[in-house]
Amino acid sequence: MQKIAGVKGMNDLLPGDAPLWEHFDNAVRSMLRAYGYQQIRTPIVEQTQLFVRGIGEVTDIVEKEMYSFTDALNGEQLTMRPEGTAAAVRAVIEHNLLYDGPKRLWYTGPMFRHEKPQRGRYRQFHQVGVEALGFAGPDIDAEVILMCQRLWDDLGLVGLKLELNSLGQAEERAAHRADLIKYLEGFQDILDEDSKRRLYTNPLRVLDTKNPALQEMAAGAPKLIDYLGEESCAHFEGVQKLLKANNIPFTINPRLVRGLDYYNLTVFEWTTDKLGAQGTVAGGGRYDPLIEQIGGKPAPACGWAMGVERIIELLREENLAPEPQGSDVYIVHQGDEAQVQALVAAERLRDAGLDVILHASAEGRNGSFKSQFKRADASGAAYAVIIGDDEVASGVVQIKPLRGDPNADAQQTVPSDQLVDRLIDAMVANSD
C-alpha cells in the first residue's frame, strides 16, 4: 500500500529535534516570568472576519495566504489563524479582561499561511508573542524590545540587529499617503504587479519591497517620519531614549512598515544575516487602533511575535544547541520474576524523582544482557540497574555506572530495598 506523506510545508517535530525546541521553550518561559506576563491560549480556528478586520483586507495575508473554509454545519466562514495578535485581542474583548486594568499577556502555538514553502517560511509555523494591553507610554514599547534582547542573551545569540520606525497616527499617515501616491504614480512604468496593485490600497507596502529594481525608487520616496506631529515625535524619541539608557543599539529604518495594517507609532524588527532571505526573527510594535477595530473599547496596545523555527535554525547555525541529556537510569533484566521486580524498581526510582528507562521486550524477546547493555549505553543513561533471576533470589540488584563516574567499571551489589538511597548517593558523589 502506498505511503501517505505529510503536507508540504507542514513539518514533523522529531525526537532528535525536540530537546532544542524544549530548550528554547524553557528560555522563553523563564524570560516571560521575569517580566510578569501571563499566558493566554486561543483556538486555532477563528471567524474569518476577525482577520479581515484586524489584519487588513488588502494585506498579503488576507488576500492570498489564509487557510479559510466554510463550516458545513452552519455556513460560518472560518480561518486557521495566520497570526496570534488578533485572536488574543478578540479573547481579551470577549472575556472583558481589561475590566480591572492593563494586562501583560503571552501566547505560543502553530500558525498557518498558504504560501510557497522555503527556508524559514512554512505553511504551518510556530510563534511566540506578547501583548501588553492598556499601556500608552513609550516605556512599554521599550520593555517589549528589551524582552527580546534578554531572550537573545539567555540563548547566547549575538549579532541580531534592531530596526525601528514610527508610523505615527492616522491623520499623519493620511497626509503622507497622499504625497506618497503622487510620488509613486511617477514610477508606474517600473512598478511590478504587486506594487501596482497596492498603489492605491496600501502604498506604504510598496516601499517595503524586496525587489532590487524598486529599492532605489523606495529610497527617494517621502518618509513617513517627516510627517510625524509633536506627540508622535515625542513618543518615538521616548522609546529611543529608553533603549539608549539600556545600551540597546538600533537603526532607524524609515521604510520599515510591517505587513499588518493594525500598527501605529512604534514598529520594530530584529533581523539576522545568517538565515538568507528570511532574516526577520521577531517583529512588532504598537497597535492602538486594533482593540476598537475588533469591537472593544479603545485601549492602547503593544507587542511582538517571533518565529520559532527561524530562531531554532539560528541556534543550530550558531552551534548553540544544548548537549543531549540522557536518563538517570536504564534497567536491564532477564527472567520472568526479574521482569516483575524491574518494573517495581523502576516505579520506586521514578517516585524518588529519577528519570528511568525500563528495557522492554521487542517482538516477544527480551534480548541478552549484552544486547540490553548496548541499548543502555546508547540511551545516554548515567547508570544501569541489573536484575536477573540470581539477583531476585538473593534480594539484591546491581548498579553499574555507564559514564561520568571515575570508577565507571565499578559495579556494586546492593540490597533491593536500598536501591533508591544507594543510587542517589552514587549520583550525588559523581556530581561533586
UniProtKB/Swiss-Prot annotation:
One Gene Ontology cellular component annotation held by this UniProt entry: cytoplasm
Chief site of localization: cytoplasm
Compartment(s) where it occurs, according to its Swiss-Prot or TrEMBL record: Cytoplasm
InterPro entries the UniProt entry points to: aa-tRNA-synth_II (IPR006195), aa-tRNA-synth_II/BPL/LPL (IPR045864), Anticodon-bd (IPR004154), Anticodon-bd_dom_sf (IPR036621), His-tRNA-ligase (IPR015807), HisRS-like_core (IPR041715), HisRS/HisZ (IPR004516), HisRS_anticodon (IPR033656)
Catalytic activity, EC: 6.1.1.21
Reaction(s) catalysed (UniProt annotation): tRNA(His) + L-histidine + ATP = L-histidyl-tRNA(His) + AMP + diphosphate + H(+)
SUPFAM superfamilies the UniProt entry points to: Class II aaRS ABD-related, Class II aaRS and biotin synthetases
GO terms assigned for molecular function: ATP binding; histidine-tRNA ligase activity
Description of how the protein assembles with itself and partners: Homodimer.
Family: Belongs to the class-II aminoacyl-tRNA synthetase family.
Protein name per its UniProtKB record: Histidine--tRNA ligase
Organism from which the protein derives: Ralstonia nicotianae (strain ATCC BAA-1114 / GMI1000)
